[in-house]
UniProtKB/Swiss-Prot annotation:
Keywords: Mitochondrion, Ribonucleoprotein, Ribosomal protein. It holds the Pfam family L51_S25_CI-B8. It is found in: Mitochondrion. It comes from Rattus norvegicus. This is Small ribosomal subunit protein mS25. The gene is Mrps25. It comes from the Eukaryota. Component of the mitochondrial ribosome small subunit (28S) which comprises a 12S rRNA and about 30 distinct proteins. Belongs to the mitochondrion-specific ribosomal protein mS25 family. Disulfide bonds: none annotated. GO terms for molecular function: structural constituent of ribosome.
Length: 171
């Protein structure tokens, strides 16, 4: 992607991955109501410009809707799976204060994030074998340089048990 436009660093993977807001699974929709002018909505505008891309990257299951110039004061509304709505007033807050506030009320705890990362690393460890939904590889024959499965490619006769038993019987 070309590095053109307003603040193109926002579109790099490093920047997108550096966001620290990971919502709980119960958050389904996030709406941001803000104005494009006025001093009171400056934090909300910066939040939309700098932090919304990071939140979208870290939370792909959350639908994010932006409403411009439809409200006298900026606010965020979260729709939860249970049907509840959480309303957050962001009128006089800076973008970092907004991020910290929503991280505190609707974000996952640090311990939970660490546990999920550890589980993900264990699940996709290259030394684990099993069904695809649990492991990276189903069989040892998928590792490059290993002997293929006898069901797919017949083994050389020197590697079969019958041949070795026949050799021992003959000598």
């Amino acid at each position: 992607m070309p590095m053109k436009g307003r603040f193109p660093i926002r579109r790099t993977l490093q920047y997108l991955g550096s966001g620290d807001v990971v919502f709980k699974e119960s958050v389904k929709v996030m709406t941001v109501n803000y104005n494009t002018h006025g001093e009171l909505g400056e934090g909300a505008r910066k939040f939309v410009f700098f932090n919304i891309p990071q939140i979208q990257y870290k939370n792909p299951w959350v639908q994010i809707m932006l409403f411009k110039n439809m409200t006298p004061s900026p606010f965020l509304r979260f729709y939860l799976e249970s049907g509840e709505q959480v309303l957050v007033d962001v009128e006089t807050k800076s973008n970092t204060e907004i991020v910290e506030h929503i991280k505190k009320i609707l974000g996952k705890k640090e311990e939970t994030l660490r546990e999920e990362e550890l589980e993900k690393q264990q699940r996709f460890h290259p030394g684990n074998f099993g069904p695809r939904k649990y492991c990276l590889r189903e069989c040892m024959c998928e590792v490059e340089g290993q002997v293929p499965c006898p069901g797919l490619v017949p083994l050389p006769k020197e590697m079969t048990g019958k041949y070795k038993a026949a050799l021992k019987a003959n000598t």
